[in-house]
Amino acid sequence: MGFLFTSESVNEGHPDKLADQISDGILDACLAQDPDSKVACETATKTNMVMVFGEITTKAKVDYEAVVRQVCRDVGFISDETGLDGNKCRVLVELHDQSPDIGQGVHGMGTKSDEDIGAGDQGHMFGYATDETPELMPLTHVLATKLGHRLTVVRKDGTCPWVLPDGKTQVTIEYENEGGAMVPKRVHTILISTQHIEGVTNEKIAEDLMNEVIKKVVPEKYLDADTIFHLNPSGRFVIGGPHGDAGLTGRKIIIDTYGGWGAHGGGAFSGKDPTKVDRSGAYISRQAAKSVVAAGLARRCLFQISYAIGVAEPLSVHVDTYGTGKIPDSEILAKVKAAFDFRPGMMGKALDLKRGGNKRYQTTAAYGHFGRDEDLDIFTWEKVVPL
């Protein structure tokens, strides 16, 4: 019996994603100078304004305003027409040291070894993998994300000069369940809403989106005469970016992960250093789940881990292969526990998470944190661990 499932994505010019990239741009700047920086940086943006706020303890000397403006320019917010001008917008900075109460409990104010560093907070994180794509990611999520990325490519390379930074995509796929494994059959619906300049016709928008975006991304085998296309269905999307909607860090956590598949513990990633297990725990969980599927132990895998603040060892670890495991889940879990060290300090070391700079974390903040095999030097958690 087939069923429909939908995932969405947003472009790097969506205001929430801009906020994520700014928070991670600041994290990069801190870690580049001081790998032991403790960063919890949030960003809010609205018309002609960006505010960064939170807690940062670092030896780095960072011009936070300069970082904010550069990220805005990187994305393409360089004029009022785009929704924000990174060269002249107001930038508010409210950043203070990390609470010493947290510091003494987590890292002993810098005195604890990697083996003893505790989790930066309580929480539970998930990792997910599925054999339906080469990336071992859900196809709905992969296609929605790649459509959004392609929109940015055609904007920046001049193929579609009418495209502006803000945009959203959504893909619905018809699946069949084969003994717990997800098998995509066809694309049911594609939705694209992209910000555009004044004066371009809806006919031109639809033509370019079909020929330069959809046909360049979606494999022909998934499209048929019954596939539905909604291309800028509102009819007008000139006002966008932070001028159209306020943006906040951490509001696109499903887009950042698996597009609604698997599960999510609720914690966002951007602006957080590796002692924050919301981020490092989710990264190692993805690596664990991916390694299970890559090893052929299961066609589909969900991995969960949980922590207490200040405690190094996880409280629980769990594997669910949805009935697709070649061996019992308990045996798979034993293999995972033997191959991974889930203490926060050791996860950071194994995945080289203290290394920032060169837009490492800023790159993760748009177009998904997982399934990014194109650069394993950045996305170290996508490397498969032998089990």
UniProtKB/Swiss-Prot annotation:
InterPro entries recorded: ADOMET_SYNTHASE_CS, S-AdoMet_synt_C, S-AdoMet_synt_central, S-AdoMet_synt_N, S-AdoMet_synthetase, S-AdoMet_synthetase_sfam
GO molecular function ontology, one term from the record: methionine adenosyltransferase activity
Binding site for L-methionine: 55, 98, 245, 276
Function: Catalyzes the formation of S-adenosylmethionine from methionine and ATP. The reaction comprises two steps that are both catalyzed by the same enzyme: formation of S-adenosylmethionine (AdoMet) and triphosphate, and subsequent hydrolysis of the triphosphate.
Residues the record lists as binding Mg(2+): 8
Superkingdom of the source species: Eukaryota
Subunit structure, as described in the record: Homotetramer.
Residues reported to bind ATP: 14, 166-168, 234-237, 245, 251-252, 268, 272, 276
EC class (word): transferase
Main location: cytoplasm
Protein name (Swiss-Prot/TrEMBL): S-adenosylmethionine synthase
HAMAP family cross-referenced by the UniProt entry: S_AdoMet_synth1
Co-factor: note: Binds 2 divalent ions per subunit. The metal ions interact primarily with the substrate. Can utilize magnesium, manganese or cobalt (in vitro).
Keywords noted in UniProt: ATP-binding, Cobalt, Cytoplasm, Magnesium, Metal-binding, Nucleotide-binding, One-carbon metabolism, Potassium, Transferase
Enzyme Commission number(s) of this protein: 2.5.1.6
Catalytic activity: L-methionine + ATP + H2O = S-adenosyl-L-methionine + phosphate + diphosphate
Cofactor(s), by name: Mn(2+); Mg(2+); Co(2+); K(+)
Taxonomic path: Eukaryota, Viridiplantae, Chlorophyta, Mamiellophyceae, Mamiellales
Gene this chain is encoded by: METK-1
Pathway(s): Amino-acid biosynthesis; S-adenosyl-L-methionine biosynthesis; S-adenosyl-L-methionine from L-methionine: step 1/1
Provenance organism: Ostreococcus lucimarinus (strain CCE9901)
